[in-house]
A protein has these predicted regions:
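Active-site-proximal loop/short-helix segments
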Residues: 169-173
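Short helix-capping segments at alpha-helix termini
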Residues: 157-159
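Aromatic-lined substrate-binding rim segments of carbohydrate-active enzymes
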Residues: 34-130, 134, 141-142, 148-155
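Acidic surface patches and DE-rich sequence motifs
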Residues: 16, 121-122, 168
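Structural preference for beta-strand elements that scaffold enzyme active sites
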Residues: 22-26, 46-49, 97-103, 161-167
Length: 173
């Protein structure tokens, strides 16, 4: 994987990837099939954020949006990275020297929540079921396991030199 750091450059905190200062603009879309990777690439963007999901349930309690892609851990005991492969292949076809960070929604899949009802959080919202609770030790342990498996996958992926970071998201307060 690529290395990333924040360093002072001309007195300004700057993102460095593989030792090189970067223009700190990134293109992100939830809708990778309709993503305009090539358009943004031609406009000078080299940093791209791709969204992936551990779970398979609503990601927004107010409107019940589902993940816009299959959850990596939606099936118990079987990680499925095929969506990651597809979105990265699509991006690199359009932006061959792209640098990638993944926005990882760490909300648990339904099977985990069904098996761990005492680890869920009732937000008190009307008609909303209890969901994964980031304050739960069991949730954090499961998230660590899933992150470890995802990182091991990324480190061994053919595109690993394009990856420089993760943006952890999700969980329900």
């Amino acid at each position: 994987m690529s290395s990333a750091s924040i360093q002072l450059h001309g007195g300004v905190p700057t993102l460095f990837i593989d030792g090189e200062p970067q223009v700190e603009m990134a293109y992100m879309t939830y809708f990778d099939k309709d993503g305009m990777f090539e358009d943004f690439y031609r406009a000078g963007y080299r940093i791209f954020c791709l969204c992936v999901y551990f779970g398979d349930q609503s990601i927004n309690p107010a409107n019940w949006y589902k993940p816009f892609a299959p959850g990596i851990f939606g099936t118990k005991g079987k990680a499925d990275f095929s969506h990651v492969e597809r979105i990265v292949a699509n991006l690199l076809h359009q932006a061959p020297d792209a640098k990638i960070f993944f926005r990882v929604n760490t909300s648990m899949p339904k099977w985990w929540e069904d098996e761990n009802p005492s680890e869920l959080n009732d937000e008190g919202l009307d008609r909303q079921p209890p969901r994964s609770n980031p304050a739960s030790r069991k949730y954090r342990e499961q998230t660590k396991k899933m992150l470890k498996e995802f990182l091991e996958y990324l480190e061994n992926a053919s595109f690993c030199d394009h990856v420089f970071g993760l943006h952890l998201a999700g969980g329900r307060q």
